[in-house]
Amino acid sequence: MTAPLPQGELTVARMCALTALSRAGYYRHWQASAPREEAIGVRDAIQRIALENRHYGYRRIAKQLGREGFAVNHKRVLRLMRQDNLLCLRKRPFVPVTTASKHGWRIVPNLARGMQPSGVDQLWVADITYVRMREEFAYLAIVLDGFSRRVVGWALETHMQASLTIAALKMALNGRRPQPFGLVHHSDRGVQYACADYTRVLDEHRILASMSRPGNPYDNAKAESFMKTLKQEEVDGSDYRDSRQARNAIGKFLETIYNRQRLHSALDYRPPAEFEANLPALHPAPRQRAANGERTCP
């Protein structure tokens, strides 16, 4: 026996009788309209994600759709984005910038070359870039984990003194507390990284220093790639009134958008914070110090 319907609810047969439509015709219409409604939902989601992440390409948007429960491949996303004129503008090719390294401070060899970290806090990469404001420039120093790509330290000031890079390094140290002798810190040969004040902090925390070869920014490719992303997705096109506004806006991008929301292709399209949260342990096992590992400041 069929259970009684709630008062006011119509059966399919009753609706078909009232509209002079056969039941077969009703189901044909329903089956044809369902994919159209699903396509509208996918298109709406693509538009929302593209507007919220204006530098996402179709592959990242396809990955985000998958995280939201949509079963759609990147080719379909590309087609829909092309139809809706949502494709990003073609990015300019990456042009590396060589850092001047003519100074009298100690230069150390490149320990990071060929290194393949297997966990966090085994390799940190550091770099500096400029930030254009209305009337002057500011300078941003970052420390990036070479395994998870997470920004673990940063500082922004209107000068390029060693205190800028030291502030970024100390933020990373306070937040991560790496194991002694288990971490390589890689940078270019800039004076801010080679000077005694900076290397003293590395020595105090038993961190092994590493530097790029002269005139070869590709030795620090992970940091350079991050700076390119930062410029494209936050700095370029922004109108920072002063260093305070720049610090607030860039800090939000680093801590919230980049670390916690932006999908990273090297992490199987996961944000760095999520990638780290799924690792079995935060710190690697400490390594033994090499016999010739003693380093002193100049």
Go through the PLM ranges and name each one.
Residues 1-298:
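Charged DNA-binding/catalytic regions of mobile-element recombinases
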